[in-house]
Amino acid sequence: MQLFIEYFPLLIFFIINSIAGIYWATGSLIVAAFVQIFYYKIKKEKIPAKQWIIFGLIVVFGGLTIYLQNDAFLKWKVTIINAFFAAALLVSNTFFNKNIIKEFLAESLSLPENIWSRLNLAWALFFLFCSGLNYYIAFNYDLDTWVNFKVFGLTGLMFLFSITSILFLYKYLEVEEEINDTDTINNEKTKEST
């Protein structure tokens, strides 16, 4: 359900764009973003900071797109969101010694510090790549190509990069499991001997 809620505005945007065009799709995207925030409020869930940022940019850039009847604002939104995430990861780690990726995943993963740093840098570079790629496609191809890229291309890239990250982390997870298994066996032997 959480995955559906996260991608709900994007799905609505794609469907309405194919039926009624970019400006109706943009209006629907804004409404869907409001519905998404409302859903979190009803469920009394904490709304992630990432969601507030995306919501704010959708409202501002979507509003400008509709008001000025210029789809360039909507195209810039995707570029800016990805650049913002890249900058947030890099700046927080470099200047504030705070690894955002570690903050999100530390409860479920125990990794060496250098691996957290590499993972943080990898995601920052990925978001920077997505930002540049979106800019290139948005302003060098027709609107329908960009919409398809935004909905399917970026989502697919995110999925593939997530899988790649998991595969990268897998060897560290196996080591942690072996350590936990060894600790469990040692604890059981200690109990048996007492």
From Swiss-Prot:
The chain crosses the membrane at residues 3-23, 47-67, 76-96, 119-139, 149-169. It is found in: Cell inner membrane. It comes from Colwellia psychrerythraea (strain 34H / ATCC BAA-681). PANTHER family: INNER MEMBRANE-SPANNING PROTEIN YCIB, INTRACELLULAR SEPTATION PROTEIN A-RELATED. This is Inner membrane-spanning protein YciB. Keywords: Cell inner membrane, Cell membrane, Membrane, Transmembrane, Transmembrane helix. Belongs to the YciB family. It is a multi-pass membrane protein.
